[in-house]
Amino acid sequence: DRSGSVETVYKRVSDCMERSLNGKALDSNSREIKAMIAYIKWVGHGVEKDSVPKGSGIKPPEYLDRAASPEKGLAVYTAKCQSCHGANGEGLMAADAKSYTYPPLWGEHSYNNGAGLFRLSRFAGYVRDNMPFNQASHKNPALTDEESWDVAAFVNSRPRPSKDLSKDWPNISKKPIDHPFGPYTDGFTEQQHKFGPFKPIIEARKKQQESKGKVAMVNKKNVKVS
């Protein structure tokens, strides 16, 4: 939906390189990209088209009745994230000085504003099920839902690289509720789409869909009558 087209595996991997890693797409004939594509196809072997394998994806925490708070998130970050990711979100470089033991969460070496993690639900869901490292799992989270939303708000309010997103979401009605860049079809602000509260947006979109469904039924009846 983001690109408005059917995407190849190469396109999906390239998006990860350019957005989540804030890097460049690999040459389509490179050894590395061929290896990644082969691995992805192997993992997906036997999975039926349009099905969702059990345990895949990121499930957002329970939506809050308030906006996620960067201020409260700072306290969570300081207490539970800073020891690995650094006071300034710089991460921890590995001994080889070529990679990171703990990745940077903001700044020039972090993911850019086009990455999936820049959406609060993606970040909050990921940290709720996985962080702090070696202390949490999806069955035994170490962070509460509130802490997950708030620390996501804090990290995603910090400076990071920007990507040209002008061609994203050609059908704006399909933008996720937490996509933080307008325009939108629902009348809510960019601020609310970024930090919430998200429940009013969900309810408004539900009503939009119900209204569209009623219009479609009326049109269908009119066609039959004519």
Cite the ranges covered by each PLM segment.
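Acidic/His-rich structured neighborhood in mature extracellular/periplasmic domains
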Residues: 7, 35-38, 57-61, 79
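The canonical Cys-X-X-Cys-His
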Residues: 36, 73-92, 105, 151-155
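Short, charged hinge/linker segments at domain and secondary-structure junctions
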Residues: 52-55, 101, 169-173
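Extracytoplasmic electron-transfer domains, predominantly the class I c-type cytochrome c fold
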Residues: 1-26, 36, 100-162
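Electrostatic cytochrome c docking/interface patches
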Residues: 45-78, 92-93
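Short cysteine/histidine-rich zinc-coordinating motifs and their immediately flanking basic loops
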Residues: 94-99
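Conserved helix-loop functional segments at active or binding sites
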Residues: 49, 86, 90, 133
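N-terminal export/targeting leaders of redox proteins
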Residues: 2-14, 18-37, 41-45, 161-226
